[in-house]
């Protein structure tokens, strides 16, 4: 007998996170053999607060069980935890979570209930859209001659070459080789991106910095000269808008570069930096242990001195009127992806959110969080990312891990459980704009992960320039197609890492950041990606539709997205064999019209090709 299931509306309604003051019905079933001393109770609490006990009332009975229920609403936003308790023959019993969502007696963990602000809204422009991530130096080189290039840079003339990675005699990797990709190059490819269905471009850092990754900001108010000018960025945003594409910038606000206007360790700038004098206006932004050479730095990397985000002058510089955020949004940015969000204090995130949102609810804030962001703890603090006052969305690493694991042959439940856990823990406004991906600049490209050798523990010499064999590439490509199908149709927004759609390869940083191989693309894979985009945009169900799993076996993952006027049934085949789902016809009995947008409906079921997917539009 099923005692409780937090994923089942018969036991908890509504499913998942709720608004503050929203009523939730909890229901449990207890065997008639259980002799209760008094009515069972629901116990709810927030960390650091007292437990709240709610008596449950019997509302029904069956041949073998009694059904108890109660209604709860939370007065405060925050992550709540709950369990059920009852006493029988003087002994107290607990019903807790096991197997991710099932109630068990006297074993398991607490259930989670996320309660968010009842004013929490996220931008509509990203819902139902497609994101495309670009590492600016490596996407497209316009050939435009740029002025005022800072000293110390190695300008490469071998587009597509292996990035420099070897340390010097002192063990330092300079990251100072540049291939010349620029904003004008990106602008020239807007038509290509539009054809892919892209509605949002996420740019890795573009501000002046003296390493090619540009995560060591030198000047927050200036586009790096090798990428172009501030006016070039404004023009890119204007032209992108004509294609229905928005631009999101990478905001690196937990640290600056040591070689910067603000720290100025190498006296490159005319400013008096924090390193130059304790009288510098920037000195309070940093934490020095033994001035000037010993200071707090991100992960101890001395080229990345940490800032004190709560310093009023720094907060004002970033979030104040006329500050960094205001300036770039006024130039055309649709929002920011926040690097290392775990390093940013709650108050700073709330100030940042307020600043971005004063430009309108369509501006977005996305955080880099690698774990479940609803219950994340960093530096001993329970974070409040998704309660309505900090982040709209996060980079969805849990989904990425689930997709990769499943496509490589993992147990179907190892995909279903993490996906459903996120859907249960995250607010619906967050889910609608979740950034879903299989590759980024911080991890190896998915095609390598699927088709290549395991690179964990391998040296950079081993990774450098290493290409997949034809057999490895074919395997990786097939698995990537199945992964893309999951990424495009599960809840949230698919994010393509530049070149993945064209078969680009690369193991770990910096080899996952090589130049886009224009003229040598895998056009069949590009067309496959275009088709995914067209189907995704064909139905509002993929925009904000609730998601539920409806079919799993060792090779097929099936789920439904519920729309207002139609439902979309999606089935992804991860195997090398064509498959037929015999039970499919019974799934569509209640629909008046069922049309296969991909796949083939026959008298015996639904046919799906190897490493492919099927999408069926169903209308009641």
Regions found by a protein language model. Give the residues of each.
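Substrate-binding/active-site clefts of carbohydrate-active enzymes
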Residues: 135-200, 206-331, 352-358
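Aromatic/acidic polysaccharide-binding cleft in carbohydrate-active enzymes
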Residues: 137, 379-380, 435-468, 484-522
């Amino acid at each position: 007998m099923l005692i409780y299931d937090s994923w089942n509306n018969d036991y908890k309604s509504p499913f998942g996170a709720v608004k503050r003051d929203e009523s939730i019905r909890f229901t449990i079933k207890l065997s008639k053999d259980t002799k209760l001393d008094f009515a069972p109770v629901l116990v709810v609490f927030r960390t650091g607060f007292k437990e709240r006990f709610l008596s449950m009332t019997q509302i029904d009975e069956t041949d073998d069980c009694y059904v108890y229920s109660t209604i709860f609403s939370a007065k405060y936003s925050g992550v709540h935890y709950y369990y059920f308790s009852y006493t029988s023959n003087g002994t107290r019993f607990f019903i807790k979570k096991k197997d991710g969502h099932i109630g068990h007696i006297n074993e398991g963990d607490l259930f989670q209930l996320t309660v968010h602000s009842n004013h929490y809204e996220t931008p509509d422009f990203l819902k139902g859209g497609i994101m495309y991530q670009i590492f600016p130096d490596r996407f497209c080189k316009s050939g435009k001659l740029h002025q005022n290039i800072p000293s110390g840079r190695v300008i490469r003339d071998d587009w597509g070459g292996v990035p420099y990675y070897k340390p010097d005699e002192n063990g330092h990797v300079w990251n100072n080789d540049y291939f010349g990709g620029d904003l004008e190059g990106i602008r020239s490819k807007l038509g290509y991106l539009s054809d892919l269905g892209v509605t949002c471009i996420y740019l890795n850092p573009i501000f002046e910095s003296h390493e090619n990754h540009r995560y060591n900001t030198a000047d927050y108010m200036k586009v790096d000269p090798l990428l172009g000018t501030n006016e070039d960025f404004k023009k890119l945003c204007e032209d992108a808008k004509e294609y229905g594409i928005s631009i999101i910038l990478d905001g690196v606000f937990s640290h600056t570069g040591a070689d910067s206007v603000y720290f100025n360790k190498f006296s490159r700038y005319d400013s008096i930096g924090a390193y130059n004098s304790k009288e510098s206006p920037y000195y309070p932004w940093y934490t020095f242990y033994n001035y000037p050479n010993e200071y707090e730095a991100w992960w101890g990397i001395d080229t990345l001195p940490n800032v004190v985000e709560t310093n009023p002058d720094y907060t004002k510089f970033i979030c104040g009127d006329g500050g960094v955020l205001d300036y770039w949004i006024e130039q055309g940015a649709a929002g920011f992806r926040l690097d290392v969000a775990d390093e940013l204090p709650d108050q700073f995130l709330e100030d940042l959110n307020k600043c971005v949102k004063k430009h309108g609810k369509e501006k977005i804030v996305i955080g880099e969080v690698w774990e479940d962001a609803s219950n994340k703890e960093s530096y001993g603090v329970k974070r409040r990312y998704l309660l309505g006052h900090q982040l709209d969305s996060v980079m969805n690493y849990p989904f990425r891990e689930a997709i990769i694991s499943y496509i490589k042959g993992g147990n179907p439940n190892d995909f279903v459980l993490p996906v459903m856990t996120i859907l249960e823990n995250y607010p619906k406004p967050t889910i609608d704009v979740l950034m879903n991906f299989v590759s980024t600049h911080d991890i190896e490209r998915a095609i390598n992960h699927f088709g290549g050798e395991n690179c964990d523990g391998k040296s950079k010499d081993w990774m450098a320039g290493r290409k997949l064999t034809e057999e490895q590439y074919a395997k990786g490509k097939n698995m990537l197609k199945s992964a893309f199908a999951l990424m495009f149709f599960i809840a949230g927004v698919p994010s393509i890492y530049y070149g993945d759609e064209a078969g680009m390869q690369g193991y770990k940083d910096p080899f996952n950041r090589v130049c886009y191989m224009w003229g040598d693309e895998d056009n069949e894979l590009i067309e496959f990606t275009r088709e995914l985009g067209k189907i995704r945009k064909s139905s509002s169900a993929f925009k904000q539709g609730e998601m539920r799993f409806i079919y799993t076996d060792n090779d097929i993952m099936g789920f439904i997205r519920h729309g207002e006027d139609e439902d979309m049934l999606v089935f992804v085949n991860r195997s090398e064999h064509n498959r037929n789902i015999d039970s499919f016809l019974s799934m569509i009995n209640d629909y008046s019209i069922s049309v296969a947008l991909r796949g083939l409906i026959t008298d015996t079921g639904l046919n799906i090709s190897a490493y492919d997917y099927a999408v069926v539009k169903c209308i009641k």
